[in-house]
Amino acid sequence: SRDDVSIHANYHANDPSQGWAMSRVSDQMTAAQKRHSDPADTANYVEHYNAVVGVNADFYNMTTGAPSGALVMEGVEYHSGASANFFAILKDGTAMIGSSSDYAAYKDQIQEAVGGSVYLVKDGKSVVTSAADYYNSRHSRTCVGITAEGKVVLMVLDGRQEPFSAGGSAEELAQIMLDAGCVTAINLDGGGSTTFVAKQEGSNTLTVVNRPSDGYERSVSSSLMVVSTAPVSTEFDHAL
Protein backbone atom coordinates (compact mmCIF):
# COMPACT_ATOMS: atom_id res chain seq x y z
CA SER A 1 0.00 0.00 0.00
CA ARG A 2 1.03 3.62 -0.55
CA ASP A 3 0.03 6.73 1.33
CA ASP A 4 -0.25 8.69 -1.92
CA VAL A 5 -2.71 6.32 -3.63
CA SER A 6 -6.33 5.91 -2.55
CA ILE A 7 -9.61 4.44 -3.79
CA HIS A 8 -12.83 6.43 -3.83
CA ALA A 9 -16.47 5.92 -4.67
CA ASN A 10 -17.67 8.35 -7.33
CA TYR A 11 -20.95 9.49 -8.83
CA HIS A 12 -22.46 11.99 -11.26
CA ALA A 13 -20.79 15.42 -10.90
CA ASN A 14 -18.81 13.93 -7.98
CA ASP A 15 -21.77 15.05 -5.85
CA PRO A 16 -24.78 12.76 -5.15
CA SER A 17 -26.39 15.52 -3.08
CA GLN A 18 -27.54 17.05 -6.38
CA GLY A 19 -29.91 14.10 -6.86
CA TRP A 20 -29.82 10.79 -8.69
CA ALA A 21 -28.50 10.84 -12.23
CA MET A 22 -26.34 8.88 -14.65
CA SER A 23 -23.08 9.91 -16.28
CA ARG A 24 -20.02 8.36 -17.86
CA VAL A 25 -17.18 7.16 -15.66
CA SER A 26 -14.83 9.51 -17.52
CA ASP A 27 -17.11 12.48 -16.77
CA GLN A 28 -17.35 11.50 -13.10
CA MET A 29 -13.55 11.42 -12.91
CA THR A 30 -13.26 14.78 -14.67
CA ALA A 31 -15.72 16.27 -12.17
CA ALA A 32 -13.73 14.88 -9.24
CA GLN A 33 -10.52 16.24 -10.70
CA LYS A 34 -12.03 19.70 -11.11
CA ARG A 35 -13.59 19.74 -7.65
CA HIS A 36 -10.39 18.87 -5.84
CA SER A 37 -7.91 20.90 -7.92
CA ASP A 38 -8.96 24.48 -7.17
CA PRO A 39 -6.76 25.97 -4.40
CA ALA A 40 -9.40 28.65 -3.81
CA ASP A 41 -11.88 25.94 -2.77
CA THR A 42 -10.28 25.29 0.59
CA ALA A 43 -12.97 22.80 1.65
CA ASN A 44 -12.25 20.41 -1.25
CA TYR A 45 -8.75 21.20 -2.50
CA VAL A 46 -6.25 18.32 -2.38
CA GLU A 47 -2.66 19.04 -3.40
CA HIS A 48 -1.43 16.98 -6.38
CA TYR A 49 -4.89 15.38 -6.78
CA ASN A 50 -4.81 13.13 -9.84
CA ALA A 51 -7.69 10.82 -10.82
CA VAL A 52 -5.88 8.09 -12.74
CA VAL A 53 -8.16 5.03 -13.03
CA GLY A 54 -11.91 4.47 -12.91
CA VAL A 55 -14.30 1.56 -13.40
CA ASN A 56 -18.08 1.30 -13.26
CA ALA A 57 -19.48 -0.03 -10.00
CA ASP A 58 -23.00 -0.77 -8.76
CA PHE A 59 -26.11 -1.97 -10.53
CA TYR A 60 -28.71 0.79 -10.74
CA ASN A 61 -32.17 2.00 -11.71
CA MET A 62 -31.74 2.76 -15.41
CA THR A 63 -34.46 5.41 -15.27
CA THR A 64 -33.31 7.43 -12.26
CA GLY A 65 -29.66 6.40 -11.84
CA ALA A 66 -30.19 5.44 -8.19
CA PRO A 67 -27.67 2.76 -7.14
CA SER A 68 -29.00 -0.61 -6.02
CA GLY A 69 -26.75 -0.81 -3.00
CA ALA A 70 -24.37 1.24 -0.91
CA LEU A 71 -23.03 4.62 -1.91
CA VAL A 72 -20.77 6.34 0.60
CA MET A 73 -18.44 9.16 -0.43
CA GLU A 74 -16.01 10.93 1.90
CA GLY A 75 -17.79 9.40 4.89
CA VAL A 76 -21.26 10.57 3.84
CA GLU A 77 -23.90 7.90 3.19
CA TYR A 78 -26.06 8.69 0.16
CA HIS A 79 -27.60 5.22 -0.22
CA SER A 80 -27.76 2.38 2.28
CA GLY A 81 -25.93 -0.88 1.76
CA ALA A 82 -28.34 -2.87 3.90
CA SER A 83 -29.85 -4.68 0.90
CA ALA A 84 -26.79 -5.82 -1.09
CA ASN A 85 -23.17 -6.92 -0.85
CA PHE A 86 -20.71 -4.04 -0.84
CA PHE A 87 -17.09 -2.99 -1.25
CA ALA A 88 -15.77 -0.37 1.17
CA ILE A 89 -12.72 1.56 2.24
CA LEU A 90 -12.86 2.08 5.99
CA LYS A 91 -11.78 5.30 7.70
CA ASP A 92 -8.49 3.66 8.72
CA GLY A 93 -7.74 2.91 5.05
CA THR A 94 -8.57 -0.80 5.20
CA ALA A 95 -10.40 -2.32 2.23
CA MET A 96 -13.25 -4.73 2.94
CA ILE A 97 -16.05 -6.61 1.20
CA GLY A 98 -19.17 -7.36 3.19
CA SER A 99 -22.65 -8.78 2.87
CA SER A 100 -25.84 -6.80 3.41
CA SER A 101 -26.03 -8.18 6.96
CA ASP A 102 -22.56 -6.74 7.72
CA TYR A 103 -23.44 -3.20 6.68
CA ALA A 104 -24.97 -1.94 9.92
CA ALA A 105 -21.98 -3.08 11.97
CA TYR A 106 -19.50 -1.27 9.70
CA LYS A 107 -21.59 1.74 8.69
CA ASP A 108 -19.93 4.22 11.06
CA GLN A 109 -16.45 3.05 9.99
CA ILE A 110 -16.99 3.44 6.24
CA GLN A 111 -15.27 6.24 4.33
CA GLU A 112 -16.08 5.06 0.77
CA ALA A 113 -18.44 2.33 -0.45
CA VAL A 114 -20.26 1.00 -3.49
CA GLY A 115 -22.72 -1.84 -3.81
CA GLY A 116 -22.29 -5.04 -5.78
CA SER A 117 -24.08 -8.29 -6.44
CA VAL A 118 -22.95 -11.87 -5.81
CA TYR A 119 -19.78 -12.97 -4.08
CA LEU A 120 -17.32 -14.49 -6.54
CA VAL A 121 -14.66 -15.41 -3.99
CA LYS A 122 -14.96 -15.77 -0.22
CA ASP A 123 -12.35 -17.06 2.23
CA GLY A 124 -10.02 -17.82 -0.67
CA LYS A 125 -12.49 -20.06 -2.55
CA SER A 126 -14.87 -19.64 -5.46
CA VAL A 127 -18.42 -19.40 -4.12
CA VAL A 128 -20.36 -18.91 -7.35
CA THR A 129 -23.64 -20.80 -6.96
CA SER A 130 -26.20 -18.73 -8.89
CA ALA A 131 -28.20 -20.62 -11.49
CA ALA A 132 -29.28 -17.39 -13.20
CA ASP A 133 -28.41 -17.34 -16.89
CA TYR A 134 -26.68 -13.96 -16.55
CA TYR A 135 -24.08 -15.49 -14.25
CA ASN A 136 -23.71 -18.80 -16.10
CA SER A 137 -23.28 -17.31 -19.58
CA ARG A 138 -20.42 -15.16 -20.82
CA HIS A 139 -20.76 -11.37 -20.72
CA SER A 140 -18.65 -8.27 -20.20
CA ARG A 141 -17.80 -8.14 -16.48
CA THR A 142 -16.51 -5.75 -13.83
CA CYS A 143 -15.55 -6.85 -10.35
CA VAL A 144 -13.49 -5.89 -7.32
CA GLY A 145 -11.48 -8.11 -5.01
CA ILE A 146 -9.02 -7.95 -2.12
CA THR A 147 -5.85 -10.01 -1.66
CA ALA A 148 -4.62 -11.56 1.57
CA GLU A 149 -2.22 -8.61 1.89
CA GLY A 150 -5.10 -6.14 1.67
CA LYS A 151 -4.41 -4.98 -1.89
CA VAL A 152 -7.42 -4.08 -4.03
CA VAL A 153 -7.84 -5.67 -7.47
CA LEU A 154 -10.13 -4.04 -10.05
CA MET A 155 -10.91 -6.37 -12.95
CA VAL A 156 -12.67 -5.68 -16.25
CA LEU A 157 -13.47 -8.25 -18.95
CA ASP A 158 -14.64 -7.16 -22.38
CA GLY A 159 -17.35 -9.30 -23.96
CA ARG A 160 -20.29 -9.64 -26.35
CA GLN A 161 -17.96 -8.81 -29.26
CA GLU A 162 -16.72 -12.08 -30.68
CA PRO A 163 -14.19 -12.75 -32.07
CA PHE A 164 -12.62 -9.68 -30.37
CA SER A 165 -13.89 -10.61 -26.91
CA ALA A 166 -16.13 -13.33 -25.53
CA GLY A 167 -16.48 -12.13 -21.95
CA GLY A 168 -16.72 -14.58 -19.10
CA SER A 169 -19.11 -16.36 -16.79
CA ALA A 170 -19.20 -15.58 -13.09
CA GLU A 171 -17.36 -18.84 -12.39
CA GLU A 172 -14.63 -17.93 -14.87
CA LEU A 173 -14.35 -14.47 -13.35
CA ALA A 174 -14.00 -16.00 -9.88
CA GLN A 175 -11.09 -18.11 -11.12
CA ILE A 176 -9.42 -15.04 -12.62
CA MET A 177 -9.71 -13.25 -9.28
CA LEU A 178 -8.29 -16.27 -7.45
CA ASP A 179 -5.39 -16.34 -9.91
CA ALA A 180 -4.84 -12.63 -9.14
CA GLY A 181 -4.43 -13.54 -5.47
CA CYS A 182 -7.83 -12.42 -4.19
CA VAL A 183 -9.28 -14.02 -1.08
CA THR A 184 -12.58 -12.16 -1.45
CA ALA A 185 -14.32 -10.60 -4.47
CA ILE A 186 -17.76 -9.46 -5.59
CA ASN A 187 -19.33 -8.95 -8.97
CA LEU A 188 -20.20 -5.41 -10.06
CA ASP A 189 -22.44 -4.24 -12.89
CA GLY A 190 -21.38 -5.60 -16.27
CA GLY A 191 -22.60 -5.93 -19.84
CA GLY A 192 -22.78 -2.57 -21.60
CA SER A 193 -21.93 -0.83 -18.32
CA THR A 194 -18.47 -2.38 -18.11
CA THR A 195 -16.00 0.50 -18.42
CA PHE A 196 -12.31 0.97 -17.69
CA VAL A 197 -10.99 4.54 -17.89
CA ALA A 198 -7.37 5.53 -17.27
CA LYS A 199 -4.66 8.07 -17.85
CA GLN A 200 -2.14 6.03 -19.74
CA GLU A 201 1.58 6.26 -19.16
CA GLY A 202 2.95 9.64 -20.17
CA SER A 203 -0.51 11.17 -20.68
CA ASN A 204 -2.72 13.44 -18.61
CA THR A 205 -5.80 12.61 -20.69
CA LEU A 206 -8.52 10.21 -19.53
CA THR A 207 -9.25 7.55 -22.14
CA VAL A 208 -11.54 4.52 -22.26
CA VAL A 209 -9.09 1.62 -22.23
CA ASN A 210 -11.53 -1.24 -22.78
CA ARG A 211 -13.99 -1.69 -25.65
CA PRO A 212 -17.54 -1.25 -24.21
CA SER A 213 -20.00 -3.68 -25.77
CA ASP A 214 -22.49 -0.89 -26.58
CA GLY A 215 -19.89 0.60 -28.89
CA TYR A 216 -19.56 3.69 -26.69
CA GLU A 217 -19.08 4.63 -23.04
CA ARG A 218 -22.41 4.19 -21.28
CA SER A 219 -23.73 6.57 -18.63
CA VAL A 220 -23.85 4.65 -15.35
CA SER A 221 -24.54 5.17 -11.65
CA SER A 222 -21.66 4.83 -9.19
CA SER A 223 -18.04 4.11 -10.01
CA LEU A 224 -14.75 3.35 -8.28
CA MET A 225 -11.82 5.67 -8.82
CA VAL A 226 -8.11 5.43 -8.05
CA VAL A 227 -6.52 8.75 -7.05
CA SER A 228 -2.82 9.56 -6.78
CA THR A 229 -1.53 12.50 -4.76
CA ALA A 230 2.11 11.88 -5.64
CA PRO A 231 3.86 15.00 -7.01
CA VAL A 232 4.07 14.85 -10.79
CA SER A 233 7.58 14.15 -12.06
CA THR A 234 9.21 13.29 -15.37
CA GLU A 235 9.89 9.73 -14.18
CA PHE A 236 7.55 6.84 -14.95
CA ASP A 237 6.35 4.57 -12.18
CA HIS A 238 4.22 1.45 -12.35
CA ALA A 239 1.55 -0.10 -10.15
CA LEU A 240 2.57 -3.72 -9.66
Name each model-derived stretch.
Residues 1-86, 96:
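Zymogen propeptides
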Residues 10-18, 100-105, 157-162:
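Short, solvent-exposed aromatic-acidic interface loops
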Residues 17-25, 106-111, 163-170:
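A short, polar/proline- and glycine-enriched secondary-structure boundary/capping micro-motif
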Residues 55-134:
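Active-site-adjacent helix-turn-beta-strand microarchitecture at beta-sheet edges
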Residues 64-82, 89, 129-183, 193-237:
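Conserved, well-ordered active-site substructure
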